[in-house]
Amino acid sequence: MSIFNRFIGATAAFLMFIGATQVSADTIKIGVLHSLSGTMAISETTLKDTMLMLIEDQNKKGGVLGKKLEAVVVDPASNWPLFAEKARGLIEKDKVDVIFGCWTSVSRKSVLPVIEELNSVFFYPVQYEGEESSKNVFYTGAAPNQQAIPAVDYLMNEIGVERWVLAGTDYVYPRTTNKILKAYLTAKGVSESDIMINYTPFGHSDWQTIVSDIKKFGSAGKQTAVVSTINGDANVPFYKELGNQGLSASDIPVVAFSVGEEELSGLDTGPLVGHLAAWNYFMSADAEENEVFIEKWKKFIKDKKRVTNDPMEAHYIGFNMWVKAVEKAGTTEPEAVQDALIGVTTPNLTGGVSAMMPNHHITKPVLIGEIQADGQFDIVSSTDGLVAGDAWSDFLPGSKDLIADWRTPLSCGNYNVKTGKCSGQNY
């Protein structure tokens, strides 16, 4: 090959490289970190689709800062260490500007050190146990004071529940939430003998003995309820076994924190009518914004039978907040976006306007829904206004004096109001 031809070839290759770099730079990359396989796929696949819809819709509006948005989708496969590996790849290899993802707290805890080390921006869309506030994470799901505590109050005040079964999957979210609930119930005068706690592994399928134990526990003459933090596809055999053993909502009502419209779509809901769920959004919410969202979702997914649920709304809120913050900051640079997000407001899907608080949690209504035969929820209770999420529980001794405030000059995730000190680690 002649020197001239080599020069032409090298020049062409260089120009192709520059062109590819420019194309890449002309998009803003969004990481989508949700399980598309494994035990959590039943819940998380829909959240991946939600993000693709939101990104497509924003691109139709012109994108952000004059650039199109590009989704980078990965599958951590319900494998908790793999979440961290995939998150690192999204930031270091794919150069994403923000990540939306996770469902379980164990996956979030796996991702968190990576997000902080590489100083990225992460939106977490699912209810969780609290006891955490990171500068890099924005929690658009419910904290315990926005779901678990109000659900217990409803069961206690409206149904007269006196005995409590705290049933959960064996990982950090159910264990910490139940620790908070046990402390709360004890403070309300409930005896320890009236509290039953049970944990099962992810994907648990044999519920016969456990449901039988619940039935026996509820036969002591006091109104009994199950507070469920069971996650993933284990919910399907759990509810089936309730039906098999004839446990109806009038006998022992179940209030679930991780069962919504998507999970019910795979069940025979007949035996489940009357059981409850506590969320901040239901598909049945009567609001114009919700009608528009549902119509857009069904058109995007090309299936009129597909439902919407609470974590989808959380992604809707979080994504719109991120767009506003980036436009406000004029950049996708992480620290500028983190600062710009505080105070950002956006309409939610229940008719209100949610705000991002200094502790990186948002304001949300609290709703209790009753399962109907068609797999939808009848909203039987709702707060008068929006409730701000607490990062730290008022009912745990080590947390009740802590607050999170990421505004300068405090800029702390666990500031002790009694000692006036920031403890450093935020989780």
Predicted feature residues:
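Extracellular/periplasmic periplasmic-binding protein-like sensory domains
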Residues: 241-316, 326-332, 383-414, 423
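Periplasmic-binding protein-like
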Residues: 90-102, 123-125, 163-168, 220-232, ...
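Sec/Tat signal peptide C-region and signal peptidase I cleavage site
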Residues: 19-25
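Solvent-exposed, acidic/polar segments of extracytosolic/periplasmic ligand-binding ectodomains
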Residues: 28, 345-427
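Extracellular/periplasmic Venus flytrap/periplasmic-binding protein
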Residues: 85, 129-130, 136-245, 284-292, ...
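Beta-alpha junction/loop-to-helix N-cap segments that form part of ligand/metal-binding clefts
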Residues: 42-49, 61-131, 140, 199-208
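Bacterial N-terminal signal peptides that target proteins for export
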Residues: 1-11
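Extracytoplasmic "Venus flytrap"
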Residues: 31-50, 74-81, 103-106, 170-175, ...
